[in-house]
Amino acid sequence: STVAAAALPLMAQARTAAYSAAPQMVPMKAQYAPGQLLILPRSHYLYFVTAPGQAMRYGVGVGKAGLEFTGTATIDVKKEWPTWRPTNEMIEREPQTYKRFIGNTDAQPGGPGNPLGARALYLFQNGRDTFFRIHGTTQPNSIGRSVSNGCIRMLNEHVIDLYQRVPIGTKVTVL
């Protein structure tokens, strides 16, 4: 629709170049305030608005169809090398994959082998954890694809950069 197209960053409306996950400064519609994050799952990009009409664009991996987050949230928690545990829904969907987590409260310690990667930004709505995250990954080939259980994945070096830029309380919009 025209309204939806008007909300998109200028570069996302008519992408003619090949997909690139590399951070790049791009033009952005002025309706988004500096400091906000905008995520466009269909184009696999996250935009950090740096100034009116300008944003740093990062390539991301997003949730599989039916598992993706949409709407607005705030970053209420930030963690370096976070621990990880699959959600109960993930365990129910794929019990064979996550069988070591059935019937316990175990969590995988943070570190290079952890699926959340080097950093995680925890998305909340009205003070409640959504269980969706913007995080690093151990699967760099998943960037630019819709393969996750719903979270927004970034290359570790990119999520470290973003982590340093965004404070607690940052508004996140996923269209």
Named regions from a protein language model:
Residues 1-13:
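N-terminal export signals
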Residues 152-153, 157-175:
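N-terminal targeting pre-sequences for secretion and organelle import
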Residues 51, 145-147, 166:
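Short glycine/proline-enriched turns and hinge-like loops at secondary-structure junctions
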Residues 17-132, 161, 168:
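Gly/Pro-biased beta-strand-loop elements
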Residues 128, 140-143:
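Gly/Ser-enriched beta-turn/beta-hairpin loop segments
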Residues 22, 142-150:
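Short, basic/aromatic beta-hairpin or loop at an interaction surface
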Residues 135:
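Histidine-centered active-site/metal-ligand motif
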